[in-house]
Every structure is written in structure tokens, then in C-alpha cells.
Design a protein with these regions (language model features):
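General structural signal for secondary-structure boundaries
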Residues: 11, 21, 111-114
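Short, acidic Gly/Pro/Ser/Thr-rich loop/turn segments
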Residues: 12, 39-41
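Short structural boundary motif marking the start of a folded domain
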Residues: 1-4
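NAD(P)H dinucleotide-binding glycine-rich loop of Rossmann-like/cofactor-binding domains
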Residues: 45, 72, 79, 85-119
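Cytochrome P450 core scaffold surrounding the K-helix E-X-X-R motif
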Residues: 41-48
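Glycine-rich beta-strand-centered segment in the early N-terminal region that forms part
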Residues: 21-38, 50-93
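Extracellular beta-rich ligand/substrate-recognition surface
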Residues: 6-14
Length: 119
């Protein structure tokens, strides 16, 4: 998959679009195909190395808000199915084609809302 990676903590100019390994969900997690994301102050601070990702979050892929479709579910997931439209907030990694989040951290996108509006 492709992701915007911080290769040099210098702001947006330190980002590169690169191929990275696709994440695999744990038993209580879902893999989301990201359809839209957002840009906020915390994202910019991450690209400058001033807002480090917490443990467990991708340290080099910024992005906090996302909207997309469930692409895979972990073995214990009961809340979501492949194809469900979800949105949410992650600790990092939303500037990628796919991300992993705990099933409890995703929210159903309300009917009539686009992916861009949801992100």
C-alpha cells in the first residue's frame, strides 16, 4: 500500500509518498481502506517531529482523522463487517491507503454523509 511518510521531521516538505507493508488487524481490530482523511495542527506538528506518535501508532505515518470502508476484521470482531462505512480518530497512520484500529474506536458514517464530510 502507499502512505505519506515523514522521512525527515521538517514539516510537509519532509513527507514522501512511499510503498509500505499493509497492516494486519489483531483479533479485536479492523483494517480500514481509507477513502478520505483530514489535515489539522497536530498532523503538521507530527511532520515536524514536535508531536510524536504514542506507542503502538505508526511513528512515521501522520494522520489522525479518517473515513473509509472496513476491508478486514479480526477474529473477535463482532461490531463490523467487510464493506461497512466507518470513520474515526487514530493516534497516527491515517495518511495511508489502509489503517488498523480497534473495533470500539470506529464509528458508523451516518447515512447521506460522504467520506470527505465524515473525515
Amino acid at each position: 500500500m502507499r502512505a505519506a511518510r515523514t522521512v525527515e521531521p521538517s514539516g510537509p516538505e519532509g513527507l514522501r509518498i512511499e510503498d509500505v507493508a499493509a497492516p494486519a488487524p489483531g483479533p479485536d481490530e479492523i483494517r480500514v481502506k481509507v477513502k478520505a482523511t483530514a489535515l489539522n495542527r497536530a498532523d503538521l506538528l507530527q511532520t515536524m517531529g514536535l508531536y510524536p506518535a504514542p506507542p503502538g501508532a505508526p511513528p512515521d505515518i501522520p494522520g489522525l482523522e479518517y473515513a473509509g470502508e472496513v476491508a478486514q476484521v479480526g477474529a473477535n470482531v463482532t461490531r463490523w463487517r467487510v464493506g461497512d462505512r466507518v470513520m474515526g480518530l487514530v493516534a497516527g497512520g491515517a495518511w495511508a491507503e489502509e489503517l488498523i484500529t480497534h473495533e470500539r474506536e470506529a464509528i458508523a458514517i451516518p447515512f447521506g454523509l460522504s467520506f470527505s464530510e465524515a473525515a
